[in-house]
UniProtKB/Swiss-Prot annotation:
<feature type="domain" description="Protein kinase">
    <location>
        <begin position="484"/>
        <end position="740"/>
    </location>
</feature>
<feature type="binding site">
    <location>
        <position position="516"/>
    </location>
    <ligand>
        <name>ATP</name>
    </ligand>
</feature>
<dbReference type="Pfam" id="PF12796">
    <property type="entry name" value="Ank_2"/>
</dbReference>
<feature type="repeat" description="ANK 3">
    <location>
        <begin position="184"/>
        <end position="214"/>
    </location>
</feature>
<dbReference type="Pfam" id="PF13637">
    <property type="entry name" value="Ank_4"/>
</dbReference>
<feature type="domain" description="SH2 1">
    <location>
        <begin position="10"/>
        <end position="102"/>
    </location>
</feature>
<dbReference type="InterPro" id="IPR017441">
    <property type="entry name" value="Protein_kinase_ATP_BS"/>
</dbReference>
<keyword id="KW-0067">ATP-binding</keyword>
<comment type="similarity">
    <text>Belongs to the protein kinase superfamily. Tyr protein kinase family.</text>
</comment>
<dbReference type="InterPro" id="IPR035061">
    <property type="entry name" value="Shark-like_SH2_N"/>
</dbReference>
<dbReference type="InterPro" id="IPR002110">
    <property type="entry name" value="Ankyrin_rpt"/>
</dbReference>
<dbReference type="InterPro" id="IPR000719">
    <property type="entry name" value="Prot_kinase_dom"/>
</dbReference>
<dbReference type="InterPro" id="IPR020635">
    <property type="entry name" value="Tyr_kinase_cat_dom"/>
</dbReference>
<feature type="repeat" description="ANK 4">
    <location>
        <begin position="219"/>
        <end position="248"/>
    </location>
</feature>
<keyword id="KW-0677">Repeat</keyword>
<feature type="active site" description="Proton acceptor">
    <location>
        <position position="608"/>
    </location>
</feature>
<feature type="domain" description="SH2 2">
    <location>
        <begin position="287"/>
        <end position="379"/>
    </location>
</feature>
Amino acid sequence: MSKNSDALLWYHGKITREVAVQVLLRKGGRDGFFLIRDCGNAPEDYVLSMMFRSQILHFQINCLGDNKFSIDNGPIFQGLDMLISYYKVISDGLPCKLVDFCVGKIAPLYALKYGLDTRLHLACEEKNPNTVKELLQDSVIKENVNARSISGLTALHISCSNGDNDIVAMLLNAGADASAIDANGRTPVQVVCFYNHASTLHLLISKGSADFLKRSPNNGWVPLHEAAMRGSLECVKVLLSFNASMYPRSLDGDTPRDLALQYENYNVVEFFDNYPVNQPKTSITQWLHQNLDRNGALIILQNASMADGSFLIRSSIKCHGYYVLTLVYEKKTYHFQIKSRADRWFYIDDGPLFETLPHLVDHYMQYADGLPTLLQFPVPSAENRKRPLPPTPTKNQLKLPVPPSRPIKNNNGLPQPLPYPEFTNESDSDIFTRLECEKEKPLPKLPRPVVNHTEVPNSVNVGQKGDQTMKNNAQQNIILKESISFGKELGVGEFGSVIKGIWLSPGGKEINVAMKTLHKDKMVQGEKEFLREALVMSQLNHPCIVSLLGVCLGPPMILVQELVEMGALLDYLMDYQPEIQEVDLKLWASQIAFGMMYLELKRFVHRDLAARNILLANKKQVKISDFGLSRAVGTGSDYYQAKQGGRWPVRWYAPESINYGTFSTKSDVWSYGITLWEMFTFGDLPYGEMTGNEVVSFLEHCGRLEKPDECPIHTYSIMLSCWHIDPNKRPTFNELHSTFSTDPEYEDVRIYRDRIK
């Protein structure tokens, strides 16, 4: 038996409570001695029986579906193995931590996040349909068809990644769960979209009844997001043929079209833009009520027998464009706000966007998609009950402002992000009084959870408390607008400009400065990020990092930084290649590693390390700049998970950052390797003319940038170590800095550095 399987021997199957007590007492042990058994009352639940102070206590482990488990109201875990691992570290409601287990048998592999590699997994990996067919004749193997491998994959996930339709069909016939999630939170549908297996996708939905609206717990993507990001146009077509919503939103607020645009899949963008919008199947006369409050809605639904799925929609008297869906489920009424942006995009909570209210109703009549049940029985108003209901509404009948056939676009051609409406128990009057002016305010992004229950410090949170913290910290170094004068523009970007200026310090000294400003149309969106960047920089003090002198609150808001005279390293590399020696490149590499080591110690991740963001003070000194994407990581965590969308520099990003939005010092190390490559190619674009999507595919197939002509073998080996697929096997910045400080290969750098001190 393998070491991995030995760790899973805590399961005792269908033993009774009394037998569990006898087994634990007979085996003996200290506090925290435990076993897991089946729950007699609930077939999908389990029971934790454990010893504490010579007594045996029992705790029901509730199965919440989707291989998720929890004890009472405690944390939710994917897999029993993750639940046990957690309670071995912290008691968190149990009388003590779990310690040793009473040896039983192998736990059910379908109830784990990380199981064992079975013969079925291996046969699927080898694409051997005959072996798979033979194995599925075994009743035990068939019963465990949803078992997870040591990598957290079901057999169906493996075959879907291969696009092996014959094996997929056999697995579905054997009862494979077409909506199960793997260790990365992806369903088989998301896997086939990732690998662009359109025929397999059709098979999963048509034969396996796969849930193609299921969201990834990591980023909130549905399969259409995955297909759009990968440029899998045929998969996009299949999903839309099954009436998938065109505009679901991720946790970042991105629609599939947004991702297609970000990853330069312009054929997918064009397809979305030209896809015909179907006429809605329902009419507002079937379910819309005017001048109706919550109590009135309840009375109408009670008179309509309160059948599950009965519903109506009522408009707000005070706030035009807002609606409330009142839905009956198990004799209770549920109220969901329906918001819209400029009477155009309608949505419930973090659900998809719809071009009209009837389109929203159509969707939820077909898919519950977060609601407690389908919309089934529309209840018309008294006025409309007296007239025949039209089978299909026309635009004139809608009596609602008709939106354009495609998403609203902002100046960048991107669909505008929409807010996350809170579910509330307030009265309708309170809701809409509070929201009356919200349409004029900047719309918030969707929240997403902090990883591993580790709270990111307030200073980097997006919420109101975090905003106030940022403002308070920034105001410690306020610079009056009257004390600065503006000079020439040094550079311009998507969100703002950098302007050379002079600051008259409180001591009366004139100091040359660089001032970062926002474009007028980016004021609302960018001010919070400016404050965030100011907060990050205010906590840093290092010779290899650009210093923040203060913040001018304006208007406009300005970040006032030290002026780094020679500008971006990228420009210098391209413009002055003949003047740059190998020792210069090595010196700069050592200084960048030194500055990043400092960030590593301060528990910051930069997230945008690139030659364009390294500035030259002089030929002998570089400084790391541009902390607009930088984030702190919480105590007890080594990584940060992105909460915001936007355009990411994919060419500089590690695979885990591209795929899962996970950033750490180790993802910064990957970017450091790309920056080294830029330096030794004198400013070449990483991956040349590849699109963002092609870069992702190149990396997944173990592709790496080639050695630059002017790069020593030893330095290229450092780059390759930075690009290891396993983040834990990449060097730390401390190790990188040590290499430049102690390795004989870089003796010339140390001599040069000592000479210029």
